Structure formats: structure tokens, C-alpha cells
Amino acid sequence: MAPNRYNRFVHFNRLHDWNLTSAQARDLQNRLALDVCRLGNVAEPRFIAGIDVSTPFRARGMGTAAVVVLEYPGLELVETQTVRGNIDFPYVPGLLTFREAPLILQAFEKITHTPDLFIVDGQGIAHPRRLGIAAHLGLFFDTPTIGCAKSRLCGTYIEPASEAGNFTELLDNGESIGAVLRTKNNVKPLFISVGNKISIEDAIFWIMRCCRGYRLPEPTRFAHQAAGKFNTGANLQQT
């Protein structure tokens, strides 16, 4: 029997509790990083999810997580789910997951389409302990996941050529941890890295396939808009 792609209860791995100290969180990252799969090719997906979190300055201690689902290849938006709530974990560089992931997982529990690929606004393995938010969530989802960050967290690189599609390696102490990808002519590049169950080559391919004339790929662009609109009080249609 074919899998139900309209399952009202989309499940994920519940790997651990979120009530941790900063030291415990770092130890957990070091352990979970060993489980990330950096290989894999994504078959033609039907649904691609985008994930982003907005934490407005004026709403300290609050955040909004958005999970959107787009149907490929047209990249039509078919579902938007948002959750607003408290962010309990303090801001600590490298521990973004522990601030944002609990809200993301609450939003994910509401979706009715089963994604074949996730694109997360944030780092995958391009992280000091090789477990940024995209890699961490990729283990929860057990599905191909890509980290698509707007800025660099660690590593060094040579600026890619100015035309869309060009990229260079992101290196950290000689290890290749991602790619610096130009997604639009003459605009700042994005920092792409493996989240889980995908190769960096395939990650670059799918990011470019999801771009439609903007710097951000459509899944995270829609997720960014959804989280921002929710915070400003705009009405969002949830399908």
C-alpha cells in the first residue's frame, strides 16, 4: 500500500527532552552529530517543506515557528502551519536549536502533508559541533534535510562568482562542511550544508531547483513570510 501523504498525524522521532543546561546541550550535539547521514540522493519529491522561526525584538521571550509545504515541481503553497509561544532557552551561540526547535516541532505536528524534503533556515553540519538546527531536525524527521543559512556560523571560503549557480566550498580546519552558493546574480550567497540523509551535491541541486528569482528558495521564503506575518497580526490561511 502506498504511504498516505495526507496523514493528519505526521510523526517524528522524539529523540530527547529539551530541558537541558547549556553544557548538556553541547554534549548532546556532539553525540547526535555522529548519527547524521551526509550521503543520499533525493528522488523527485512531491512535497517540500520550508521551516523558519521569527523572534521579534519587541516580543522578547516569544517566537513564531512556521512550517510550510509546497508541491513540486510547481512550488505551489499547499499548507501553512504556524505556532507562537515562549522561548525558554537562553541565547547561546551554537545552541539555536534549543531555542527554536520546540516551537518548530509543535508546528510540524499540525501539518497534513508528508514532506519528502525539508529546507531549514539555519545551519546543517556547518556548525562548530557539526549539528546545527537543520541537522538536529533532520534526525527528528528522519527525512532528507538541507540547511540553508543566510550567514556563516563557522568556516572559511572564497567568494563564489557573481552569477547564480556558482558555489565554493565552506571549509573548517580542512574539513568540507558545506557550500557557499550564489542563488541570484549579484546578490549575497547562501550557506548550504547537509542536514541529514542527503549529499552536499544534491543539497545544492535542490536549492537551485527551488529558487524562483529570489535569493531565498521558495520553501524558506514562504516560511519566512508566514512567520513574519503571524507576528505582525496578519491573517494567514491555514489549509
Predicted regions, residues:
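Catalytic-site beta-strand/loop segments enriched in glycine and acidic/polar residues
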Residues: L105-A135, F141-T143
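Short, well-ordered, mixed-charge alpha-helical segments that flank or form enzyme active sites
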Residues: R58, A126-R129, L153-Y157
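C-terminal binding/interaction regions
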Residues: F9-V36, A101, Q106-A107, K150-S151, ...
